Amino acid sequence: MARSVWKGPFLDGYMLGKADKARASGRNEVIKIWSRRSTILPQFVGLTFGVYNGQKFIPVLVTENMIGHKFGEFSPTRTFYGHAVDKKAKRK
């Protein structure tokens, strides 16, 4: 079920301050965040966030197409190695 419109988008409180500081400094440095559940807002377009996936920070450059999505969608937590190959079928 989607979030109610009257509540507005979810965002951890510290993130707006970090984004404002990064934009004011003018340097394009990675902003480290642990909040995968936060919604991407229009103010974040053009900034690079390091989204923690449980092991390391994955750099995510925010574009206009990402607005309204969650940060966790762009930082995968699991590695897919492929399905096991049947050795008997491969020999034929």
Curated annotation (Swiss-Prot):
One of its GO terms (biological process) is ribosomal small subunit assembly. It comes from the Bacteria. The keyword Secreted does not apply. Disulfide bonds: none annotated. SUPFAM superfamilies: Ribosomal protein S19. Transmembrane segments: none annotated. One of its GO terms (cellular component) is cytoplasm. Keywords: Ribonucleoprotein, Ribosomal protein, RNA-binding, rRNA-binding. Pfam families: Ribosomal_S19 (PF00203). One of its GO terms (molecular function) is structural constituent of ribosome. Belongs to the universal ribosomal protein uS19 family. Protein S19 forms a complex with S13 that binds strongly to the 16S ribosomal RNA. This is Small ribosomal subunit protein uS19. It comes from Paramagnetospirillum magneticum (strain ATCC 700264 / AMB-1). The lineage of its organism: Bacteria, Pseudomonadati, Pseudomonadota, Alphaproteobacteria, Rhodospirillales.
